[in-house]
């Protein structure tokens, strides 16, 4: 009799476990937006994503990657692409046709381009024309594509003496090498150097670049992606971008 009772309880326990497991397996996994792009806007978008999650309960993971990694990762599990300038999105789309829904592409918050110089501006650099002077050592970041602002003849490197690949490497080079006199870059990078450098703005529309965004074709979370882009257009997001050196 005791054996039969034990067997019955075992059967009931097994049924409960099966029901619980089945219920758990049908639960909808939490929606997570994966946003990929370069390092420059990464920290700003991460701060926006944190506030967006707090307000709307949608988790957004912002991941920075170099171009060759973006080409691999975004088609795999990316929901949104962001760039540091318009040409970056255009280049990605050219290399990876069909990955982005180009009808969703839009250019958000602008960044001013200017010249980072040493504190006190010892060489009295006030514009592009001064970068042509003999003895001015220029830092160039390849991914920023700033050659047109170096004052040199097209096809020549002019006074560029220091070459790095990313903006983060640019910050490091500026701090480690006091022989660098000027770095043509975005105002947002100068925010990290305010205590040790000056920023000379380059005037005009050609010295302003926007932050492009686009939703991927593969995303299963289209509605959430559109909601995040709408949030990035909000006054709250604008305040975050302004704080980090965007215009």
Locate each region found by the language model.
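Exported/periplasmic ABC-transporter solute-binding proteins
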Residues: 22-59, 68-78, 85-86, 91-94, ...
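Bacterial N-terminal signal peptides that target proteins for export
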Residues: 1-11
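Residue-level detector of intrinsically disordered/flexible regions characterized by low predicted structural confidence
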Residues: 4, 20-21
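Bacterial N-terminal signal peptides
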Residues: 9-20
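Short loop/edge segments at beta-strand edges and connector loops
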Residues: 64-66
């Amino acid at each position: 009799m005791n054996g039969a009772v034990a067997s019955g309880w075992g059967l009931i326990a097994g049924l409960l476990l099966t029901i619980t497991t089945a219920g758990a397996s049908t639960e909808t996994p939490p929606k997570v937006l994966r946003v990929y792009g370069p390092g420059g806007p990464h920290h700003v978008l991460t701060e926006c994503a944190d506030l967006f999650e707090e307000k709307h309960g949608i988790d957004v993971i912002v991941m920075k990657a170099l171009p060759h990694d973006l080409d691999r990762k975004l088609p795999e599990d990316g929901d949104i692409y962001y760039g540091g300038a318009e040409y970056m999105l255009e280049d990605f789309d050219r290399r990876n046709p069909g990955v982005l829904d180009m009808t969703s592409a839009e250019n958000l918050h602008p960044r001013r381009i200017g010249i980072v110089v040493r504190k006190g501006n010892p060489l009295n650099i006030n514009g592009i024309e001064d970068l042509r002077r003999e003895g001015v050592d220029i830092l160039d970041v390849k991914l920023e594509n700033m050659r047109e602002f170096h004052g040199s003849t097209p096809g020549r490197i002019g006074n560029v003496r220091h070459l790095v690949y990313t903006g983060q490497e640019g910050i490091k080079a500026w701090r480690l090498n006091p022989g660098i006199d000027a770095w043509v870059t975005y105002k947002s990078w100068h925010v990290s150097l305010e205590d040790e450098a000056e920023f000379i703005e380059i005037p005009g529309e050609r010295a302003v670049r926007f932050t492009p965004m686009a939703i991927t074709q593969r995303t299963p979370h289209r509605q959430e992606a559109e909601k995040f882009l709408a949030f990035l257009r909000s006054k709250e997001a604008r305040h975050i971008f302004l704080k980090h050196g965007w215009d």
